[in-house]
Amino acid sequence: YDETNELFNNYANGRGLYGNINVYLNFLSLNIEYINYRFGTLDPDNRGNFVDNYGLFQPYQNPPIAINIHENILMNRVSHQINMNNEVGYKIELMGMINNWIDILAIYSASSQSHSWFMDSNYQWKKEGEAALFPHSDKKAATPFQEFYGELSFYMIDQKLHLKAGYSNSYDVTKLFLNTKTDTSSSMYYDLQKSIAIPLNISYTFESGWSINARVETQFYTKGVRQVGTLNGSTVVDTFMSTFYNDKNNNEIPEKNEYLDYETNNFISLSISKSPLWSLAFTLDKTNVSEVINRGNEFENTLEKLFNIDQSRNWVNVEFVYNISSTIRLSLLYGSLKGGLVCTNGICRIIEPFNDGFKMRLTSMF
């Protein structure tokens, strides 16, 4: 390569700021986190173009993310994906004890890009205003994100019975497609996802290390494209096109009367375990929407046949986990897996689904 090539010398100048405050009040603790990352302010069309924008955020930096990392399956699938190059936000977390058998947890997170974006007369993206120190919660052109999560944990029957109930409500503008303005009118298109989730977890511990656990999660998930248009200060267009539909006609083609306002998801897991050796779990993942390509009966697995489950909207599997040692764990899964987005510490990856198969995983912890 040529060291004088502009590609290798045109580095971007950026910076990142993170702050954390902890306050302890008797049986309560308050944690406040703040992030202001501006390694590169890329426009909405180039936000993910790291090939042509060399020298921005690097994965090895791995800075804090200041959002809640969900343990629950359905909420984790719609996790906000942090823009490490340009994001300003904060997280407020309150946790503690109401009494000696009830714990409380409440978390509020908010973030956005540092600038709003609009298109000029040549349809070129331009930044609007000065860089913000706090999130633009009311400016959709800055792709805002907001989430509240609350949780109560109950410890009963001499700490043998553990009940945990939660509630989550999130709002996330994930992509800005268009934002034009004139003296008398404006038009904006953006991708929006909203989620309300209610997780419930019940576990009971017996003598000699035996325990049973039940997890039930329900989610109402909205995703689609919203269009907002104004003329002379009045809103003349405000429409939402949902991504989800229910194929009532069984023709695998989305029709106008089949679109749903939101997707309803259910996740159920029943497990039994013998600490510290093994655990066995039965899992059912259910939705009310249709896939663009129907799975078809040819992919029906043994578990779906046994329980007479509609395989087009349900995924069912059995997983056995064995602890070979204190640091090595073996997992064997059979059935179908919905897959989807899984996020850990701001790093998200897609888990590929399958309809009839096995999965083996060997984990070593250092």
Feature annotation, model-predicted:
Residues 1-366:
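Exposed, low-structure sequence patches enriched in small/polar residues
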